Amino acid sequence: MALTPQRGSSSGLSRPELWLLLWAAAWRLGATACPALCTCTGTTVDCHGTGLQAIPKNIPRNTERLELNGNNITRIHKNDFAGLKQLRVLQLMENQIGAVERGAFDDMKELERLRLNRNQLQVLPELLFQNNQALSRLDLSENSLQAVPRKAFRGATDLKNLQLDKNQISCIEEGAFRALRGLEVLTLNNNNITTIPVSSFNHMPKLRTFRLHSNHLFCDCHLAWLSQWLRQRPTIGLFTQCSGPASLRGLNVAEVQKSEFSCSGQGEAAQVPACTLSSGSCPAMCSCSNGIVDCRGKGLTAIPANLPETMTEIRLELNGIKSIPPGAFSPYRKLRRIDLSNNQIAEIAPDAFQGLRSLNSLVLYGNKITDLPRGVFGGLYTLQLLLLNANKINCIRPDAFQDLQNLSLLSLYDNKIQSLAKGTFTSLRAIQTLHLAQNPFICDCNLKWLADFLRTNPIETTGARCASPRRLANKRIGQIKSKKFRCSAKEQYFIPGTEDYHLNSECTSDVACPHKCRCEASVVECSGLKLSKIPERIPQSTTELRLNNNEISILEATGLFKKLSHLKKINLSNNKVSEIEDGTFEGATSVSELHLTANQLESVRSGMFRGLDGLRTLMLRNNRISCIHNDSFTGLRNVRLLSLYDNHITTISPGAFDTLQALSTLNLLANPFNCNCQLAWLGDWLRKRKIVTGNPRCQNPDFLRQIPLQDVAFPDFRCEEGQEEVGCLPRPQCPQECACLDTVVRCSNKHLQALPKGIPKNVTELYLDGNQFTLVPGQLSTFKYLQLVDLSNNKISSLSNSSFTNMSQLTTLILSYNALQCIPPLAFQGLRSLRLLSLHGNDVSTLQEGIFADVTSLSHLAIGANPLYCDCHLRWLSSWVKTGYKEPGIARCAGPPEMEGKLLLTTPAKKFECQGPPSLAVQAKCDPCLSSPCQNQGTCHNDPLEVYRCTCPSGYKGRNCEVSLDSCSSNPCGNGGTCHAQEGEDAGFTCSCPSGFEGLTCGMNTDDCVKHDCVNGGVCVDGIGNYTCQCPLQYTGRACEQLVDFCSPDLNPCQHEAQCVGTPEGPRCECVPGYTGDNCSKNQDDCKDHQCQNGAQCVDEINSYACLCAEGYSGQLCEIPPAPRNSCEGTECQNGANCVDQGSRPVCQCLPGFGGPECEKLLSVNFVDRDTYLQFTDLQNWPRANITLQVSTAEDNGILLYNGDNDHIAVELYQGHVRVSYDPGSYPSSAIYSAETINDGQFHTVELVTFDQMVNLSIDGGSPMTMDNFGKHYTLNSEAPLYVGGMPVDVNSAAFRLWQILNGTSFHGCIRNLYINNELQDFTKTQMKPGVVPGCEPCRKLYCLHGICQPNATPGPVCHCEAGWGGLHCDQPVDGPCHGHKCVHGKCVPLDALAYSCQCQDGYSGALCNQVGAVAEPCGGLQCLHGHCQASATRGAHCVCSPGFSGELCEQESECRGDPVRDFHRVQRGYAICQTTRPLSWVECRGACPGQGCCQGLRLKRRKLTFECSDGTSFAEEVEKPTKCGCAPCA
């Protein structure tokens, strides 16, 4: 039947056709949409590293490539990818995926590549890939898969690459790989596989890469087929080894003969146990009975998968489980009790317990839980017991327990909870017991409801108490009255020793500022703190992170930045960063600036910056980067500014900057570019691109040096022959001596003596066997991901307690066939993941008990081929290996004789007996010096390299000092020579020959004339040990060096101590400096070439001259001009201020209280005494009044301002509040009070504004209090004075009588900066009464530990201490030595912490001042002029003189001298005391001078020093100090 058009439709389309059009339009719109946080380019959707917790919605239907890696996705639901029929590549690696629902990939029929590696998958659902016929590459490595089911890969018939390595696979079902006939790559290494069904790999003719090593293969009859299969394929399956039985352990499977694959019992008829995957099974390490699965204390780090579905109780306490993944217990619907106590759990998935309708007991105490996710207990309607005590929970959401209507006991004891939202326990209708103690509760107004709840429901049995505020500290919450729970800005709620969390009802918490750092707003300042790594806990609200000027060397990929979604800027400049791990900045998508200036980076690769998708500025200045390749900046498409200034860059690969699509500024200056053919592209690229570069220049070759790259013609970029292919490729992360495959590094049989450089930091398996190591390389501890280390067949003779530190992930350690004799007790400390340890083939005789205390996961110990001494000291090892059969039955005893040849595993422990001490040879292995190996009184020392070392006495050598060195017994030295035996390897001798003989045995007469000294024609005649000179007639002396008689005393013509020298021509005079002439008789004129300056006169002296300076000049050459005129001359600083010359500018340093350019104004006053005041008399009639002043006091009451009489305005402090009384002429008068109190000792600003009939009062800029009066408007009365701080008695009485003031007390404290109508008032223009002193000492200089600071005392601020405290700073308990003292008529004076003495009043004496009658004062008549009187029993009253004085009455001043001083130099600037940052040395001139002279500095030294002041400022200034004192005319 034909379809008729719908009424109103002009197009004539039927309803189905309209729906089709609408669907097509919607599909077209959906194809172009892009999910939030993702970027879409063509058919690629990139959502990696955005912090997603679930698959985003609205993915375009035409997507072909989807990047979801590096997020926090926990589960893949069936419909997450529905409709993505064109998807070819799906990246899901590096998430938290714990489960994938069957059918999730059914719509993706074009899917070719799927990566699910590095997740938390435990179970692989069957038929998961049944509709993915195009799938060619599947990566499931680095998960927690425990089995491969038969139908796991059914449907994926085109699969070529399958990676299953690094899981926990222990079972492979028969036929699991049967359909994969096109498979080329299969990895099953690093699992727990013990056996494999027959012919599992026979259907893979194209297989070229196959890995099965690092498993637990048990080579019995069921695995015989694998040996033949591997032999037929010698290039694959390398290093596949047997782990059992003991006789085959360590052998390559391909090398084991068929006859050696044997089975016990029925032999080959025995069947391989099938994988029970459907209904679950009891985990191997647990025990199961009657529905209870017991896995207590088994060293588990994760919850076992594939548990029995029928279990009703699971016990997992006392393990190392760190998290509860999504849906961990959901399949086990019959569970009634779960015990996860005493683990390391820090995270719980919201749906971890989903669907457990029968659960009545959940035990989670003793973990590290900080947060309970929303809905984590949802649906647990039958739960009766919930134990959450002994965790680190800091916040509970109000709806956390909304479904627990049947809960009877809830324990939140011993957590970090500071507050609970009202209604948290409302849904707990059946609650009978509640534990809340040992939490740092803040008992403010927000917790009032809890007190009411506990009084109404007395179910809290642990005595929960308040931690703050101080007034309620340690009081039980249920016993505090409701009105005590109040919120006050004055009270501090931070609890020392706890983390300060800022929480709301939704538990969106932010941690406090990192230790030692400063946080202001959203900026975290951690610069200059010598940090070696980035702090682990940073507030999530941080927008700028400053880490510059520290000592950070490696940036580790810890996932820190995934939590900092608001971060915009990171500053890591001026550190020591040499390595950035790939993925370090994963999740930092909002960061726009990254500063890495002045570090030690040598290369950059894209993985370093992965996650910085929003980066716009990248600063890499001042590093050591030598080369930029085309993968260096991949992914940084938004970078606009890139600075590579001042690096070591010589070349850049073509296309290196092509991915930087937004680049506008590129700084390449100060780099040594080698402008050869490799760089030709860059010159052309710079000319074509419109970006700012600063014109980088060539450094090489010489003919292009300093020429800008863009100015070099293309033909001039030339290469030498053979260099055309040399490019800038990233260095391979593998040493030259080794072979690397993924994270496996093999350096076997390379004669290595030290660890090669360049081993990748992420190495997991390191093979160093067959080398020449004598010690375990110390650098191994830097590779924290190591899982296997093979050091077998080396020459290692000893281990230390730190040989294997930081190797917490190590599972296999092979030390076989070395020279180990002794194992230190802590050698394996911290190796909690170690499962296989091989010490086979060493020289170990004993092991100390407890050596394996930390290796709790150890299941295989190889200790055979060692001479074990099986006495009582090794009994523990026998018992230990029998538990779990950790030793395969190879190790045998070598002694004592009755135990020789017996197996360690099967010999009863009681047979290990001590009949006496072990032999010396056994004991000496751990203490080799016990056997006294050093002979001839040599000294023995234990040595980690040589086992022991002998220090030999003189005359012996050799390892044990056994070789004598007496080579002189045959008297080989002739002619009286002395023989000396040599020490050392040659054991020779030397002869000390007498004078005149030489040679090895002193047999040759020495020709002494070879180096004779005869001169002037003298002839040498040889003797024995000497020679003589035969001189001509005119010479004499031993060497004929003297002329006869020419310079005798009678004939010597030389004057002025000149030296006479005889010559054949006659005597010659050699003058002393300063004289000249033939006879040295003339004084030389030294002023001939003098250098005196500034018109100075030269004065000739002997061999020198002096400069006589003109007036005003000084210096050795009169080079120092007169000192410039002091700028303070003519400057008059008032009120006792000093003038200081600062940079040729006079500055007045005011005394406390004064201000102004010349300190002419008194701005602050201190009301010290009672009944004092200031009086302003010259006031003006102002129609409006605006009065502002700053006040500091600790008093409750006091008058601040008063003006007028009948028409008045009064400002007073009343009970800590500011009260303003105002009467414009109407009655009654009006008054307002401030909401704030200001009597806390701190300065507060009081502002009073009157306008017409209105008065505004504001404290510290806060919200004003307003008062309106309908009388006439008020004006400041010029006829009546303005009183400040008090008023006269008559005025006070009148005002009090008229209720204008409520308390007549005068003000006691500080007032400063009084403004009247914006004019700063000068207190010197007032009538100041006694008791008012200038200046205010602010409380910021005084710290009162247990009290309140008050800045109103005459000497300065004082502390008002709390009860029980005393001392200047309220820091001394009152129960000091003077507490309860016995002084009757006197004052107690503490001598130390325990003792005191009594200082008696006049008229009393005695130790306790209890004797009447004053003791005669011995010093009464003695007047010491420069010192003080002192009385003693031996000398009576005498004077003790001050330094520089002497005499009986200290009346004689000592001679002028300089007393050395080393101290800080101090000056005062205003209120601040400033001192130098370091001490300096000078002399203090003291003493008297004869005549009219003065003792003063003769030599002065000027230096420029840095000062730091008490107010936080600093400055630099020249200081002149004397270094030498003496008498000189008085200045």
UniProtKB/Swiss-Prot annotation:
Residues 215-265, 439-489, 671-721, 866-916 form the LRRCT domain. The keyword Zinc-finger does not apply. One of its GO terms (cellular component) is extracellular space. Residues 1-33 form the signal peptide. Residues 1163-1336 form the Laminin G-like domain. GO terms for biological process: axon extension involved in axon guidance; axon guidance; axonogenesis; dorsal/ventral axon guidance; motor neuron axon guidance; negative chemotaxis; negative regulation of axon extension involved in axon guidance; negative regulation of synapse assembly. This is Slit homolog 1 protein. GO terms for molecular function: calcium ion binding; heparan sulfate proteoglycan binding; heparin binding; Roundabout binding. Disulfide bonds join 286-295, 443-466, 445-487, 513-519, 517-526, 675-698, 677-719, 929-940, 934-950, 952-961, 968-979, 973-991, 993-1002, 1009-1020, 1014-1029, 1031-1040, 1047-1060, 1054-1069, 1071-1080, 1087-1098, 1092-1107, 1109-1118, 1128-1139, 1133-1148, 1150-1159, 1310-1336, 1339-1349, 1344-1359, 1361-1370, 1378-1388, 1383-1398, 1400-1409, 1419-1429, 1424-1439, 1441-1450, 1456-1495, 1474-1509, 1485-1525, 1489-1527. It comes from the Eukaryota. The keyword DNA-binding does not apply. Residues 34-61, 273-309, 504-540, 725-761 form the LRRNT domain. LRR repeats lie at residues 62-83, 86-107, 110-131, 134-155, 158-179, 182-203, 310-331, 334-355, 358-379, 382-403, 406-427, 541-562, 566-587, 590-611, 614-635, 638-659, 762-783, 785-806, 809-830, 833-854. Interacts with ROBO1 and GREM1. Keywords: Developmental protein, Differentiation, Disulfide bond, EGF-like domain, Glycoprotein, Leucine-rich repeat, Neurogenesis, Repeat, Secreted, Signal. It is found in: Secreted. In adult brains expressed in the hippocampus, cerebral cortex, and olfactory bulb but not in the cerebellum. In embryo expressed in cerebral cortex. Residues 927-962, 964-1003, 1005-1041, 1043-1081, 1083-1119, 1124-1160, 1337-1371, 1374-1410, 1415-1451 form the EGF-like domain. Residues 1456-1531 form the CTCK domain. CDD domains: EGF_CA, LamG. Thought to act as molecular guidance cue in cellular migration, and function appears to be mediated by interaction with roundabout homolog receptors. During neural development involved in axonal navigation at the ventral midline of the neural tube and projection of axons to different regions. SLIT1 and SLIT2 together seem to be essential for midline guidance in the forebrain by acting as repulsive signal preventing inappropriate midline crossing by axons projecting from the olfactory bulb. Glycans are attached at residues 72, 192, 406, 571, 630, 762, 801, 806, 1026, 1079, 1186, 1256, 1303.
